[in-house]
């Protein structure tokens, strides 16, 4: 599947958002870098998925708590509370994408060097009895 020009710009915007977020974290939670990274991530996500799909993703009933905490963290970061906003935003991010964790773990099990460690962490030991 080929990406449209808008989706290609969205991928670049999302990558820049991750870069600015990482730079903001490394610079001791620098507020302007975190704010810029947040805005670029959200705009990139909207460009990749499209407006209607993004709105339906964030407004689903089972993801409402994650959406509220994610956008609350984004607003806290924008209003000069970067540390609190970052952690609230991370909580929202984990709640938004928690349905994808089994898929990510099953993919990581197939990666050659990471797979055995993931198997040790996620598999349980059955008792011999």
Curated annotation (Swiss-Prot):
One of its GO terms (biological process) is endoplasmic reticulum to Golgi vesicle-mediated transport. Keywords: Golgi apparatus, Membrane, Protein transport, Transmembrane, Transmembrane helix, Transport. It is a multi-pass membrane protein. InterPro entries: Got1 (IPR045176), Vesicle_transpt_Got1/SFT2 (IPR007305). It comes from the Eukaryota. Residues 30, 89-90 are lumenal. Nonessential protein required for the fusion of ER-derived transport vesicles with the Golgi complex. Can be replaced by sft2. This is Protein transport protein got1.
């Amino acid at each position: 599947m080929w990406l449209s020009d808008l989706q290609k710009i969205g991928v670049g915007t999302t990558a820049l958002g991750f870069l600015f977020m990482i730079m903001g974290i490394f610079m001791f939670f620098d507020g302007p870098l975190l704010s810029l990274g947040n805005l670029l991530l959200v705009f990139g996500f909207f460009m990749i998925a499209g407006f209607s799909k993004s709105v339906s993703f964030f407004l689903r009933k089972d993801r409402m708590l994650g959406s509220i905490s994610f956008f609350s963290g984004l607003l806290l970061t924008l209003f000069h509370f970067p540390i609190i906003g970052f952690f609230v935003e991370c909580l929202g991010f984990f709640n938004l994408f928690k349905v994808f964790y089994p898929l990510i773990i099953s993919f990581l099990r197939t990666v050659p060097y990471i797979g055995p460690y993931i198997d040790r962490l996620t598999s349980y030991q059955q008792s011999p009895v």
